[in-house]
């Protein structure tokens, strides 16, 4: 990916070209078949972000209902409150293969204003280090819906910590409703600090991205650290709501070098010759340079806003923003769309874990709610 400066977002960070969804049907069919053939024994892999080989670990991902990939969605279908669901298996309404390499499902918000689909696939990697979280709650009578993708590297500890604690911490922040942007930034930093303090093995270098979409009333707050990404479809156009944190981004490189760090080329641009992203949770020995300070974008929900896509780089490395939006539009609903995105990414040769959330806005329900509110007033 080419370097880009500033803190703004790009319309298509993975490149773009026109793609008619019907022309992709053959690719989609091949993708589904490829997913079905993916149940082969795991093998050691390379963590491309750390640039090192690591042994086969976390065999619990082969243990059916106790798989950590399933843990990423326990709230969905089981509980839509801040409280953690007690179920140890996949969520109700989800599908999981016999070795927990692929899980998908759907969810509709309590207020009926949005629905989502999610898909998480270990893919060609030996280990599953992607986690995700979907929560719904009320704070001071405000309906809150939260969606997050956490893509781990060097191990799954950091991503799992975020899945368990990031939204929990945010919902407890005293300024969450009155100053949401500041609350998000402070919560990201606190959760990073808590993880580093809680990790007893100081030699571990686990890290994780975070791409989150937080819905408060009629506003969306998208925050990101790392190279997971959130893209919206607005009036038919793909628009990125986050900007990947890469070491060769002009502003990021300057920040790292001002802090005494270096950015070097080793297969790709890396911080200290090691990490292929410039911001992350964890990464203790690079913490001075690799910060967990999020960039936060605010977006008002209007009738032109059709859906959001949140995904790990297992999708974005091989599917452009525009193509992802086109694939989602071609599907009947968000659950089928999330599944299709994972299938397409795998068929196109993605070598990473692939996790996607598609959030669709149900504007008819929103209009009814607005009319009812107007009549009461």
From Swiss-Prot:
Chain residues that bind Mn(2+) 2: 151, 313, 352
A Pfam family assignment: PP2C
Catalysed conversion reaction: O-phospho-L-seryl-[protein] + H2O = L-seryl-[protein] + phosphate; O-phospho-L-threonyl-[protein] + H2O = L-threonyl-[protein] + phosphate
Binding site for Mn(2+) 1: 151-152
Sequence ranges of Basic residues compositional bias: 51-63
Low complexity bias (residue ranges): 21-39, 80-89
PPM-type phosphatase domain mapped to chain residues: 115-361
Entry keywords, A to Z: Hydrolase, Magnesium, Manganese, Metal-binding, Protein phosphatase
Entry superkingdom: Eukaryota
Disulfide linkage: none
Gene Ontology biological process: signal transduction
EC number: 3.1.3.16
SUPFAM superfamilies linked to this entry: PP2C-like (SSF81606)
Cofactor(s) annotated in UniProt: Mg(2+); Mn(2+)
Cofactor note: Binds 2 magnesium or manganese ions per subunit.
GO molecular function, one term: metal ion binding
Matching SMART domains: PP2C_SIG, PP2Cc
Region (Disordered): 1-68, 80-99
Similarity-based family: Belongs to the PP2C family.
Record-given protein name: Probable protein phosphatase 2C 7
Higher taxonomy: Eukaryota, Viridiplantae, Streptophyta, Embryophyta, Tracheophyta
């Amino acid at each position: 990916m080419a370097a880009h400066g500033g803190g703004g977002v790009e319309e298509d960070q993975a490149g773009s070209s026109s793609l008619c969804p019907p022309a992709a049907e053959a690719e989609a069919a091949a993708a589904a078949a490829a997913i079905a053939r993916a149940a082969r024994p795991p093998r050691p892999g390379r963590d491309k972000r750390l640039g090192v080989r690591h042994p086969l670990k976390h065999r619990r991902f082969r243990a059916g209902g106790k798989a950590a990939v399933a843990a990423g969605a326990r709230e969905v279908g089981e509980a839509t409150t801040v409280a953690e669901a007690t179920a140890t298996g996949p969520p109700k309404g989800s599908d999981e293969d016999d070795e927990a390499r692929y899980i998908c499902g759907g969810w509709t918000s309590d207020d009926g204003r949005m629905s989502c689909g999610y898909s998480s696939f270990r893919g060609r990697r030996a280990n599953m280090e992607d986690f995700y979280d979907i929560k719904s709650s009320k704070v001071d009578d405000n309906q809150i819906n939260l969606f997050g993708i956490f893509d781990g590297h060097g191990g799954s500890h950091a991503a799992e910590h975020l899945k368990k604690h990031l939204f929990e911490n945010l919902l407890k922040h005293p300024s969450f409703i009155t100053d949401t942007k500041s609350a998000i930034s402070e919560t990201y930093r606190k959760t990073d600090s808590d993880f580093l303090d809680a990790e007893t093995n100081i030699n571990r270098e686990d890290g994780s991205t975070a791409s989150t979409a937080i819905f408060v009333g009629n506003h969306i707050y998208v925050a990101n650290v790392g190279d997971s990404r959130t893209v919206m479809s607005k009036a038919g156009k793909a628009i990125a709501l986050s900007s990947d944190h890469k070491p060769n981004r002009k502003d990021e490189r300057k920040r790292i070098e001002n802090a005494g760090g270096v950015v070097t080329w080793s297969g790709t641009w890396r911080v200290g010759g090691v990490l292929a992203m410039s911001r992350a949770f964890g990464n203790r020995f690079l913490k001075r340079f690799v910060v967990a300070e999020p960039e936060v974008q605010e977006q008002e929900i209007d009738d032109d806003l059709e859906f959001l896509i949140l995904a790990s780089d297992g999708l974005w490395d091989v599917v452009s923003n525009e193509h992802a939006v086109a694939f989602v539009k071609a599907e009947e609903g968000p659950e089928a769309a999330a599944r299709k995105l994972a299938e397409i990414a795998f068929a196109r040769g993605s070598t990473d874990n692939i996790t996607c959330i598609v959030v669709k806005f149900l504007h008819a329900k929103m209009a009814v709610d607005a009319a009812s509110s107007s009549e009461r007033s």
